[in-house]
Swiss-Prot record:
Quaternary data: Homotrimer.
InterPro entries per record: HSF_DNA-bd, WH-like_DNA-bd_sf, WH_DNA-bd_sf
Signal peptide positions (record): none
Function: Transcriptional activator that specifically binds DNA sequence 5'-AGAAnnTTCT-3' known as heat shock promoter elements (HSE).
Alphabetical keyword list: Activator, Cytoplasm, DNA-binding, Nucleus, Phosphoprotein, Stress response, Transcription, Transcription regulation
DNA-binding region: 21-115
Protein name: Heat stress transcription factor A-5
Amino acid sequence: MNGALGNSSASVSGGEGAGGPAPFLVKTYEMVDDSSTDQIVSWSANNNSFIVWNHAEFSRLLLPTYFKHNNFSSFIRQLNTYGFRKIDPERWEFLNDDFIKDQKHLLKNIHRRKPIHSHSHPPASSTDQERAVLQEQMDKLSREKAAIEAKLLKFKQQKVVAKHQFEEMTEHVDDMENRQKKLLNFLETAIRNPTFVKNFGKKVEQLDISAYNKKRRLPEVEQSKPPSEDSHLDNSSGSSRRESGNIFHQNFSNKLRLELSPADSDMNMVSHSIQSSNEEGASPKGILSGGDPNTTLTKREGLPFAPEALELADTGTCPRRLLLNDNTRVETLQQRLTSSEETDGSFSCHLNLTLASAPLPDKTASQIAKTTLKSQELNFNSIETSASEKNRGRQEIAVGGSQANAAPPARVNDVFWEQFLTERPGSSDNEEASSTYRGNPYEEQEEKRNGSMMLRNTKNIEQLTL
């Protein structure tokens, strides 16, 4: 048996050198063709296949002798590699078309099959694709990690800055609280000091806060009601209006009394013209009870206006007037003039106060009194003689009151008015007062109204000039 194995080995080596069949095929052919091992492996009845009868003994005895291993499964895989196939499912019978008994030369036609990598290549390609996908995902995750780390670093820096700002704000708030506490402590200490309170009160009293509390009076047009014979007062205005009118009448009566005193005989007499506005639709700033804007202007500017010479003229009634009958006497008017601060009514007629820029001649107290009484007598004589004309004039005023505002009448040149309104060279104080008086827009409107009244009262004016 050893000699047979030696011969087979020599033939195999010779076949390999001459390019014969594969050593596995030669060894298998010799192992099957050995008759001494027919109980383990032998040819089939057709001599074109071989049968392994006992695979356990085959693995234990024959495989280590020919192939140096005892793995039956590995032997079967090798058979499959060279094209052998199992033909009987019940036993281990293998067949190859060129593996036939007594035809050993056909073994050179059996070739080893090339390994088919159809099953191995797809896993390799899929592995590469998966590896590429995984690598791409890893790169993406790395980029996201870097961005997150940058944001985290930025947030840490912002946290440090915010913490610093918070500390500064806390210090600032603490400083403000300390200042407030110090201020409150100082105020408590100062209030307890009577000297400080006294000095503070003096400072407050010295402050001129009247300018902040002043309110400008808006023009208010009062609608006068037709006077009745039974009534003596026109109560169209309210209580506040009456109080201001009473105060003004008191001041006006005091001025009138001072003019008649001898102490004021040497002072310049300046007169203002105050006319009624209810019957002609004028602003209440020019009426007697509401206050003269020129008088207010001279009071604010502090011009040294002297007490004025007063003349009585029948130019209309005031907004709040006392009704006089045609048989009213001079004594009744004088009594009302002297007691105007005690009564709530106004004069039955306006006092025309005209401004003279030049100083009037010096008169004694007796001359002033005589002149005033003479003017009063002349005025009331004119009132008695022109009672009917006044009634007619009131009706015309009531009908044409709106026309006076729409088309102001032309100014009438008269010798009596020109001697007072014409500017004369005189003292600088009177010139300053005259310029201030002429620059007032209320005076221009009143002059226009004076012109319309002068047209209706020309006869009375002529009597006054006599």
